[in-house]
Regions:
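Intrinsically disordered, low-complexity segments enriched in serine/proline and basic residues
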Residues: 3-9
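Acidic, Ala/Val/Gly-enriched low-complexity intrinsically disordered segments
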Residues: 11-14
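N-terminal secretory signal peptides and thylakoid transit peptides that target proteins
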Residues: 17-36
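Sec/Tat signal peptide C-region and signal peptidase I cleavage site
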Residues: 42-48
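Flexible, low-complexity segments enriched for small/polar residues
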Residues: 48-72, 358, 362-393, 402-574
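N-terminal accessory alpha/beta regions
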Residues: 72-182
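Amphipathic alpha-helical segments that form the core helices of the histone-fold
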Residues: 73-92, 204-215, 386-392, 550-554
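Active-site substrate-binding loop specific to GH73 endo-beta-N-acetylglucosaminidase modules
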Residues: 200-214, 218-434
Length: 574
């Protein structure tokens, strides 16, 4: 859907061999660029000497994981692809490695409740407002009104960054690879944008509470969890939606009447699909049904102290979702042909039940799953079977995934898929055998590659086809990343700089500048990893790298060989 950095998409490159350089490469990497340009953009699934079992193992690791890490190919070949898939479908049975569990335990945000996160953000916003007022009132006052303001901004920046830490650490190192792939898929399906206000601090909670527990559970449970999470309520503004006249009665300055954003997107994107048979009137009626679905309000600390209520028992529940009957439209409604009698919050629960069980929802989700795991153009017969399985099991996502991986369409290695930037970066780090304690450079790389983590501003999420991601500039950026990673120039084991800018926007810019320096320096920066061993890399990837590419690698200067593997057309497909 989105071109890379505004460049026009060039889907034709996906269909034709490349006989000239794909794009101007960095001149000091001329040897790598010349060799990469000579390779042909076509499927390179090589099952000759490696054998059918190894090829099948590679296939499932590329489709159901973020590619093989060292030892994965041998392990899956020995145990069999079917046994590995059965293991992946029950991630709760797989223990996390101690190093990963330790890094996750060190994160602060997962221990914070929604209420605490929202309170911190609002107190930061209040401090910023007071500082701005002070600057306006006094020309020589150029600093925040209190030292607390700077501390608060640092806390918010840490929460913002920890969402990415938690996601990437698990995607790279967890043995529960299918779960991680599905977390990415379903977060993208129920997308929220981390850059919007309150969602700066809520995205981690949203993924941990509303997405991750449900990726192999019931779709209805995930639909309800996302609908009620404050990250979604805030992102699509349903927390402000009120029945006509309610704002005047309650004097709610921020409530501007009926808001249709969530009602529209939950049908168009989350359930029925754009061709799901609903009308604009259905959107309006569903918006009326969902009035009153909001967040419990928490006043900033300064106001609580002023009112003598700082220690008031406001509760420490995990959720701040609340139904406000004074905002709800209690009139009769007709939606999707259903007469909906007044029933408060249960009207919304009825609507979500109906959407989760609708045949159009089954088909829409089946099509998206087939596109993600099988082909850019989903096979119609597979979509039919997955939709039927979804309906027969009342939206059991584990059963649907089992049907998908058992299908002949999934087992067929053709056609191949072109990796998104997210898949490319993760698979490159995993294949290189790098155990990272600092994923922030990878977050910066994802931004440079056009797919910032949690950075899709529109509710439809990132698209997942070759036409969306294959263009000359994008390939140039990928080769540059492959070169920096392979040569050990990325500081993936660097301890965070305590003097980094406090704001998350400044922090991301600093990471991007650091990534730029890493890409152009001849020498690794502090905290960089060792150069990638090309022999170990080729052993890890096995039949993924074609005979032709291996020959090109052998003719390349040793210092560039691992970069050529990671920047090859073979590696950019899965």
């Amino acid at each position: 859907m989105r071109p890379f950095n505004g460049q026009p998409l060039n889907a034709r490159l996906a269909k034709t061999p490349m006989t000239r350089p794909i794009a101007p490469m960095l001149t000091r990497r001329g040897a790598l660029a010349a060799t990469a340009a000579a390779l042909v953009w076509r499927p390179a699934f090589a099952a000759d000497a490696a054998g059918v079992d190894q090829a099948e193992a590679l296939h499932v690791l590329n489709r159901l994981a973020f590619g093989p890490a060292p030892g994965d190919l041998d392990r899956v070949t020995q145990m069999g692809a079917r046994a590995w898939i059965a293991e992946q479908l029950h991630p709760e049975r797989l223990a996390l490695p101690a190093w990963l569990a330790g890094q996750l335990d060190a994160l602060r945000t997962p221990n914070e409740t929604q209420r605490e996160l929202v309170r911190q953000y609002r107190e930061m916003a209040e401090e910023a407002k007071l500082a701005k007022q002070a600057e306006t009132a006094s020309a020589d006052s150029k600093k925040p009104a209190t030292a607390e303001g700077g501390d608060r901004r640092r806390q918010i920046a840490a929460i913002y960054a920890e969402a990415g830490d938690e996601r990437l650490l698990q995607a790279l190192g967890s043995p529960r690879q299918l779960q991680e792939v599905l977390v990415d898929f379903w977060f993208n399906h129920f997308n929220v944008y981390q850059g919007k206000g309150l969602d700066r601090v809520l995205v981690e909670s949203y993924e941990r509470e509303a997405i991750r527990p449900h990726v192999l559970g019931r779709f209805r449970a995930m639909l309800g969890a996302t609908a009620k999470h404050p990250a979604m309520l805030f992102y699509l503004d349903n927390w402000l939606s009120v029945a006509p006249g309610t704002q005047a009665r309650r004097g709610a300055a921020k409530a501007s009447g009926l808001n249709e954003n969530y009602a529209r997107e939950v049908m168009e994107l989350h359930t029925l699909g754009v061709d799901g048979g609903y009308t604009q009137q259905d959107v309006t009626e569903l918006a009326r049904i969902l009035t009153g679905w909001t967040m419990q309000q928490e006043r900033p600390r300064r106001r609580r102290v002023a009112d003598g209520m700082d220690n008031a028992a406001s509760g420490r529940g995990d959720s701040i979702f609340g139904f406000d009957p004074t905002r709800h439209d209690n009139g009769p409604k007709t939606w999707l042909g259903h007469a909906v009698a007044p029933g408060g919050q249960m009207e919304g629960e009825f609507a979500l039940d109906a959407l989760a069980r609708h045949p159009a929802t089954a088909r829409h989700l089946a099509s998206k799953l087939a596109r993600r795991f099988v082909a850019d153009t989903p096979p119609p017969a597979l979509v039919d079977r997955l939709a039927r399985r979804f309906q027969d099991t009342d939206g059991d996502l584990r059963a649907v995934m089992q049907a998908l991986v058992d299908s002949p369409e999934f087992r067929d290695p053709q056609p191949v898929k072109f990796k998104t930037p997210y898949q490319f970066v993760l698979s490159a780090v995993r294949a290189s055998g790098i155990v990272t304690s600092n994923v922030k450079p990878l977050m910066a790389q994802l931004t440079q590659l056009g797919q910032p983590l949690y950075g899709c501003q529109t509710p439809d999420g990132w698209h997942d086809t070759e036409a969306d991601w294959l263009n000359p500039n994008a390939i140039t950026q990928r080769v540059n990343f492959a070169t920096a990673l392979a040569s050990g120039k990325l500081p993936l084991q660097r301890v965070d700089d305590p003097n980094a800018p406090a704001g998350e926007a400044n922090g991301m810019k600093a990471m991007e500048r650091q990534a730029d320096r890493a890409m152009t320096r001849d020498q690794p920066v502090e905290g960089s990893t060792a150069p990638v061993d090309v022999g170990a890399l080729l052993a890890t990837l096995g039949p993924a790298i074609s005979v032709k590419t291996r020959a090109a690698v052998a003719d390349t200067p040793p210092a560039l060989r691992a970069a050529l593997v990671l920047g090859s057309p073979d590696f950019m497909r899965r």
